[in-house]
């Protein structure tokens, strides 16, 4: 489970960041301003964010692995068709659909990984899964900058390439993943929990939970800053610092690579000490 979800996050972020190094090239082809280029990213993240709650609810009802698999297939197809777009409006619509496909992954993935990973190793397990984001960000940067900026290939080629492994992994998700994984020694506890009264939690209770609200705010501020950097850093290096070719992808990749050691070290520390609140406070 950890391995396949790790690969999933690699592809999730690679299919996003292949766009960033070639923003200028696409802008020249369609005659776009930086504002319009920003819109292409914004529409993707808007549909990605909006889709997460509905897909989480659907996953709870019909099965998480089905939602993840279908989402990845949609992502693969929309990534491929992104490279076929002949107008900016068409590109926007396709990227919006790609965002919807990615929105199907986030909630169901964490639900399944939480079920599958033992509690004593849950933080480090999720940290390993999440480190796929850094690998994917770096891979997307390097692929686009190497093929398009250095080799002079058409900007669509990275989209065509990334669609293939994304489609394959979508199929693997459906064939490999299992719902409600029961680990050895936990059968009795799981059976007792399922026999007892099942408490239903409403969305109102979720959004009124103080700890969850604090987590929402913390995630929003940190993720916002992170995505501003990974979205515009390649374009900044090209336009303002004069970098060319694969060096754009390499330098941009330093940001995600730097996050991996810290994530794994502090995740392991949290599993050992259980001092989640103190660690979060210290890091913030």
What label would you give each PLM region?
Residues 50-87:
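Conserved MFS/SLC helix-loop-helix module at the cytosolic interface between two early adjacent transmembrane helices
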Residues 94-135:
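Cytoplasmic helix-loop-helix junction between adjacent transmembrane helices
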